[in-house]
Amino acid sequence: MGKIIGIDLGTTNSCVAVMDGDKARVIENAEGARTTPSIIAYTDNETLVGQPAKRQAITNPKNTLFAIKRLIGRRFESEEVQRDIKIMPFEITRADNGDAWVNVKGDKLAPPQISAEVLKKMKKTAEDFLGEAVTEAVITVPAYFNDAQRQATIDAGRIAGLDVKRIINEPTAAALAFGLGSTKENQVIAVYDLGGGTFDISIIEIDNFDGEQTFEVLATGGNTHLGGEDFDNRVIDYIIDEFKKEQGVDLRNDPMALQRVKEAAEKAKIELSSAQSTEVNLPYITADATGPKHLAINVTRAKLEALVEDLVASSIESLKTVLKDAGKSVNEINDIILVGGQTRMPLVQQKVAEFFGKEARKDVNPDEAVAIGAAVQGGVLKGDVKDVLLLDVTPLSLGIETMGGVMTVLIEKNTTIPTKKSQVFSTAEDNQSAVTIHVLQGERKQASANKSLGQFNLEGINPAPRGMPQIEVTFDIDANGVINVSAKDKNTGKEQQIRIQASSGLSDEEIEKMVRDAEANAEADKKFEELVQARNQADGIAHATRKQIEEAGDALNADDKAKIEAAIADLEKAAKGDDKAEIDAKTEALIKASEPLMQAAQAKAQAGEQPQQSAKDDGVVDAEFEEVKDNK
């Protein structure tokens, strides 16, 4: 059996790691980088992922997709998606099932299908490093992801050809990376994870007892729609508004200009982590009747901080809530771990330090810790990492809708998983023959204000006065945080159960179709790569043969020369087409036609050696040499 790899599937960047001996190792991608931009571009003949996709984003804005994690498992009508529609250069559309999908070149693509392209890149990166096929992975998700978002992430893994052995929360993974092998007893850490699109805060207790380490999540919270992308968007809005004031042109209507501004805003934000000011300079950003327009705006660190201070403040509010849920005070936190690229911002570091009254650790790489932790969990599942126990929690309360539109909670938020809980309910009317079990996730008392995870019916209840039948409802949450719900009539023994697959999720048939499409695309990609190699080989042989014709000169007779040149012309014509077999055949034909050229070259070389040899012999005196030994 092969290795279980750890993948941090990020909003902005993704990272892959694997256990190498007793340590987790981050794997460099084909471009030599340790992280890969979570960007996918669809061109006329191929799908680009990572840096190659990012490089062409400006010229292909409508078909270059980024921050897809913000859409995964979300309904089209949701407030977060409607907010994104206004600022994304690509088209977000409503799927038949009500999900937020993306329209690319007339095709509707599901977020798990798009995210699978990034996972395939991570899989290939690991396979190139390990020299063997990889089929199993641990994939991380924000701790505050709901059931639909977790299911969608597992679906993305399946489409990419990966058996997702475990979904692990990002802050928990970071804690594993930080605490593995530590000999300290009973330390409580806070993991503040502000990534590209999501924010999590988890309070985790790491306990060492008799050689075994236990990582227990005490409480978790956050916001699955707050991250570096939102910080970028504040800068983008500022730049666009300033340009509109100066030039009277709104760049939001120009996708190509918007993409250029997005890149510049992200770059400016990063630069302002180390500089006090930076200039955003974009010549020829647009044009109108008066001619081309140039954008030049100075952005200071103070201005950036003013633009985003409410976002940072909202993350600090979450800190207060989670500490309270964990039953801990600020003074009981031993260490603070910062995870996610956005935590490099000085304002974020300052506000977190002010809240806890101490500086965060500087020895944890915010871009790599999550993938490393996922690889460690892969090692635990594989049996390569011993004496480590991970106890995670469910981030949101789970329950069912009961009479009066109330949510009755069966499993409280921050309950350690896996877990199972049952409760007995009854009918609301006399002689009721069926009940509908409506499964909910959230913290509101009003059922309609929570996230609906799905519903099912239990039928065949014997007629009886209201309140008499006993219906036992059981919630079962596995280690991935995925939920199974069953309802059983204790009188008749009839039972109905469902694995919660959100009504907005992909069906098994859709996933299988996407898996088949991915496999077909992989075959098409392989054929395209082989065609390119054949073209390159043909070009190289044609060029080398031409050079040899020149060098052979008169040693090559005219008929042979004409045949070789005709073969070169045939090969170059074939190389412009898409038929690899034709290119290979014409390559072989040129090699065969070039045989007289080899003979001519050899004859010319031999003819050149003869006079040189005799010239060398003229006036050469044979000498005898005596070996002198140095005895010093």
Swiss-Prot record:
Chain positions with Phosphothreonine modification: T198
Compositional bias of kind Low complexity: 601-613
Region (Disordered) residue spans: 601-632
InterPro entries: ATPase_NBD, Chaperone_DnaK, Heat_shock_70_CS, HSP70_C_sf, HSP70_peptide-bd_sf, Hsp_70_fam
Keywords: ATP-binding, Chaperone, Nucleotide-binding, Phosphoprotein, Stress response
Pfam entry (one): HSP70
Source organism superkingdom: Bacteria
GO molecular function, one term: unfolded protein binding
Induction: By stress conditions e.g. heat shock.
Family listed: Belongs to the heat shock protein 70 family.
NCBIfam families attached to this UniProt entry: PRK00290.1, prok_dnaK
Role summary: Acts as a chaperone.
Protein's name according to its UniProt entry: Chaperone protein DnaK
Organism whose genome encodes this protein: Actinobacillus pleuropneumoniae serotype 7 (strain AP76)
Gene expressing this chain: dnaK
